[in-house]
């Protein structure tokens, strides 16, 4: 067992424009090299474009896109008797949110590499795709679900 103390969770201050902790976490995921102002411009610009395209408020688009991408199940490796099994487990709320934020960011980054568009446009497109239950981030979630479903037979090896 570890002799260290359990790490304290950092308190994240809400973002300045929408006063949302989830959006502040998303800005932290997008941020590179401590450039918060650039990350805020990208996220706020993408949200305003999404708001203009759909006609709903930016926060409702963001929260529903996030809820559509958040996974409920994932697989974890468990070694039993010299054999490694992929055991499906439920995902805790905090991990589910952080996975969804990372997947949306990663899907927008890969779209940015494939096209000649700005990152803000790719992020807007990815948020709208996640809102409509399509796109790269939603595809990653569905792959995780398929893995969990395929390994359902090993669910009795749950972690304690």
Curated annotation (Swiss-Prot):
SUPFAM superfamilies with a match to the protein in the record: Ribosomal protein S7
Q: Note whether RNA-binding occurs among the keywords.
A: yes
GO terms (molecular function) for this protein are: rRNA binding; structural constituent of ribosome; tRNA binding
Q: Does the keyword rRNA-binding belong to this entry?
A: yes
| Cross-referenced Pfam families | Ribosomal_S7
The UniProt family comment states: Belongs to the universal ribosomal protein uS7 family.
Query: Function of this protein?
Result: One of the primary rRNA binding proteins, it binds directly to 16S rRNA where it nucleates assembly of the head domain of the 30S subunit. Is located at the subunit interface close to the decoding center, probably blocks exit of the E-site tRNA.
Q: What is this protein called?
A: Small ribosomal subunit protein uS7
Please tell me the species this chain comes from: Ehrlichia ruminantium (strain Gardel)
- Lineage of the species this protein comes from: Bacteria, Pseudomonadati, Pseudomonadota, Alphaproteobacteria, Rickettsiales
